[in-house]
Amino acid sequence: IMVVSTQSAVNASGDIAGLVNLAVAETNQGYANSGVEITLQLAGQYTTSYVQSGSFSTDLSRFRGTADGYMDSYHATRNTVAADVMMLLINNSSSCGLASGIGSTASTAFAVTHYSCATGYYSFGHEIGHLQSARHDPAADPTNSPYAYGHGYRSPTSAWRTVVNTAIFDAV
């Protein structure tokens, strides 16, 4: 994964490098806890001078755009560092995150996360989960494509949940 942070997120976080490393570690622990044999590796982290728009969908579109004049240079950097997934960390508390969709290709493997939700709320791993074709829990999203069992899960006692389950509590 390659992570790009806005200057606003960098300033607000106090330690963006530590936050990104923790987000990667939490995501990898979630994979391990679920028996998913994937290891997320940080290909690089960068700070952009891009000024957030105030809209997650606009920021995501501008991040994905290759020739729109916003964050175009990061696409070449992505190729250089061989990152499969791109994450933009922003300082916008209107939501915790937004992925390009359920499932992804090289041109759609992009997500945006509010820096303060990236860890603890597990939104960093949550948005990556969507890019890997995982959906929210069936109560929140009953769609069964592309996988009938590709949903978040919460244990019957609520003692734990998967990262794409929409219930908010600590155990993951």
Predicted regions and their residues:
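Fold-level signature of zinc-dependent metallopeptidase catalytic domains
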Residues: I1-T105
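The catalytic-center signature of Zn2+-dependent metalloproteases
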Residues: Q45-S61, T108-V172
